[in-house]
Amino acid sequence: MNTKNSNEARKYTEKDKWGYVVCFGTVLIFIAGIGHVNSFGLIYKDFIVDTHSSAKSLTTAHGVFSIMLAIGGLTLNVITKRCSLRLGGLIGAVIMSTGSFVTVFISSTNQLPFTFGVLQGVGFGMIVPVCYSTFNHYFVRKRTQVMSLIKATQGTILIFYPQLLKVLLSRYGFRSTLLLISGISLHTFPGVVAMNMSTKTNKNRTANVLTIENGTNNQETADLIDKHKDKKESQIDVATKNIKLSIFKRDVLEMLNVKILKDPVFCNICIGQSFVNFSDLIFFVLQPMLFYQYGLSTNQVAACISISAGADVAGRFGLAFISSIASINTRLLFYVATILTLAARIVILQVRQFIWLAVVTSFLGVLRAWLHVASPLVISHHVTHEDFTGAYAVFMLSTGLVNIIFSPIIGLIKDVYQDYIPAFYALTACCLPCLFLWPAEYYLKYKLNK
């Protein structure tokens, strides 16, 4: 008996130890995969000028990347019915690394929607669910605490990423820097290899559903084949195809969680958050370009990006501390952070001195952390635990659609006016759907309940 307990204790100890390897792999994947994304303006500024490219291609690339993340996740869901989760992640790493390497040879930013948006988007979209699924397998009680530590570690490393890119660009040039970034992306492979779960992979769920639905009819089908093999064979084939087709349709509907779209509150949450998250992403991608237009040097722009990353980390730690001593309404937090973000962006479009730009950027970094932390929690608090994965996939698709539709419009505004400021006002206005639709929802609920 004691030997059995000792073996079980050793088993769980080894599982806990490997769980921290999974944490390291998760940090490695996010840094290697998308660590450079916030520094796009720093990387491509001179390239856009030299090739006479448009800013629309840069924003479109991020729009495509956003929707391809969701498609990559759905693709992984299909692949893992026939192979292991880790193998699906490795396929994603191959696709993402290929996209990163091909980017080295682009002749204009018009190729970025494919090399970065499609290839890297689908690849990274296949890797992320592998990370979170493996993480959830190893951590249950300490999940929030450990995930906060992972995100804080990522943020701390990202503080120094713009400075590293600035050095690489000055010493090795544009193409060599892209080649080094593609080399860094190869670190996603050891990160995915670390995603090892001790449990065996489930068998093909489609086959199981087919067996369950036809369980009572299996013997009858066999009898029909034996008695009327020649006459009924074609009918059985047609029936089998119809059953498989109906199961496929149901799998697609389950995968997309279409039933959640019947919930108007969830749809309102999706619309509001999709516009805010789109606005946040494109704002920080184009922010270095705006600062260059203001006349800041490369050192000052890199410093602002690092300050924003540091403020993001501080915001996460601060929110973790506040939530440990007081209960926080995550939807209210998201709404208040959106209001403050709108105000701070208007301010940053009025000032030109480096010190004030750095101060407002740090404030925006804190608000960005609050938005990112609250975003999935708003959804998880509204839907059941069983529906969360499907609901979040629908939200990712919603965000991707907003990105792919409105990203080119933002880039077009900049190209038409030959000025980044009108484009940033348009990005700021993207906060308004959330700020107007959410209070309208509360007003209608209050009026109906009165």
Regions found by a protein language model. Give the residues of each.
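Long, low-complexity inter-transmembrane loops of multi-pass membrane transporters
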Residues: 1-15, 190-271
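Hydrophobic core of transmembrane alpha-helices in multi-pass small-molecule transporters
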Residues: 31, 99, 111-126, 151, ...
